[in-house]
Amino acid sequence: MKLEKLVGERFKERPADCVIDSHAIMVKGGYIKYMANGIYSSYLPLRRIVRKIEQILREEMDKIDGQEVQFPVVMPAAKMVLGMTHEEAAVHLVREYAQSYTKYPFMIYQIQTKFRDEARPRAGLIRVREFTMKDAYSFHTSQEDLEQYYEKCHAAYERIFERVGVPEVVSVKSDSGMMGGNISHEFMLLTPVGEDSIVLCDSCDYRANMEAAENISDIARDAESAALEKVYTPNVHTIEDVCNFFGDETKNSCKAVVYQQNVDDKYVVLFIRGDLEVNETKLVNFLGEQVHAAVITEECGLNAGYIGPVNLKVNGDAVVLYDKSLEGRNNLSCGANEAEHHYKGLDMERDVPNAEYHDFAKIQEGGICPKCGKKTVKISRGIEVGNIFQLGTKYTKSMNMT
């Protein structure tokens, strides 16, 4: 076909609404056309590229004994008519077939248009409401067999990205989130315009996304502990204000971050080192419940800006948690649970003897690598281009296949 006959407009100038280069190139070159927020039509040049990518996907899935199927887009559910993924449909498709152990293992896959009610579409095709996905589902009779096949899938994905020619794709340990299961990996394309934070180590091969990366604290306990002293601190509310008032660093403070559980509005008070941020994915996984930022009222008994672990009182049922960054620490500043008052000289072992500690913190640039122990952690940006999970029996058990 001659170029003059090719449907679609091509432009010399960069479109003003294109923030990143890839979006601008596709619009300028006549690959896509904007229809609505997060929704694009594609012209012939892009369709040819997509078909080639799909062929690579099929070849690599077939190499590991995958069988291509097609699930319906519409699901028999009142609230979720359009299927986000098809775990339930996959179990439904093979449940009667897989009655004998001789049928296992096997894998089915499809390439299909997916839909997301995306709240913030952005950057052309990077975050959209409609896109093409290859999703695969494997079935096994043992955990050992699942783990062996998982490695085959991991290798297949690496071959796919190599054949497609995508540069700098790294496999990182990830949180399974709503998908369930215990083990998962994301394949991340490293790019400054990426939305996800990726934890890399310059000294070893450790890779993880921010949600799954363990935070390790190495701040030692002081040789001597000062006495716990309540201090009048007028107009001091934030952790930065507190540390400035006492002339100390934020790493030597204990701050409270308060949430409420979505299911029952129960308060969750989390104490963490003052210079760290809460990794809310870790918190949700620990609680088994979704949370939101708390609305602190007079009735709850908490004194916003002055919450501390000593003599903490919350009206009603509440969950009180402590991050590992506070374990063994002493000579800290914290809230005194009284307006315009803070403590200095907090010793966690002495003043909060029954505290149990868990990892709820985000790892920081230059932090300690969980694998090699060196302070060579680097935080990069990336775009998720693939994901694999070990889901276990979450779906097969709930649908009476096991």
Predicted regions and their residues:
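TRNA-binding/sensing appendages of the translation machinery
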Residues: 1-77, 132, 137-177, 275-276
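Conserved oxyanion/phosphate-binding beta-strand-loop segments in alpha/beta enzyme cores
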Residues: 1-34, 65, 103-128, 386-387, ...
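Pocket-edge structural micro-motifs
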Residues: 36, 43-44, 83-84, 113, ...
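Hydrophobic alpha-helical hairpins/lids featuring a short glycine-rich hinge
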Residues: 78-113
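Extended, low-hydrophobicity, polar/charged segments
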Residues: 87-95, 120, 125-136, 144-402
